[in-house]
Amino acid sequence: MRILAIDPSSNRIETSTTGIVLLDNAGLVDSWVLPFGAQNFKNWFKSTGRILEFDIVVVEKFEVRDNDYSRDNSVVETIAAIELCYPNLVLQRNAGYQTDIPNDLLKALGLWSFEKSHHNDVRAAARLGLFYAQRNDIEEVIVDIGNRITQMAS
């Protein structure tokens, strides 16, 4: 299963980035790190995102908190732009994803360090894609994780 997983950025904070990975089961096909915001995502989609082959798009679900005025809720604007490009996307909460997909697993699968960024947003996208597969019992992804770990151990 090919999963396009996206960790959306702020639409206002210029140092924020959107992390994107394309996974083939548990293997990395490609990754991208985009400058902040909706417009930069739309630009990437026009040049790259619209021609990608995938089975599902998974985007981190952002929980708006009305009572926390220090929090940047503009991520929802970036998600809205992503949804215009990929109307059938799945919004996935990330609660528990660091426990279910630990750092050591990402490292073992080669999904820890990425050339194009400081890694955090791309790593979060990779974790989100695997978390979605695990939580939804996507057998081919889970089997591939097991096979890759077994091969590394032998």
Language model feature labels by segment:
Residues 1-154:
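Phosphate- and other anionic-substrate recognition elements at nucleic-acid/protein interfaces
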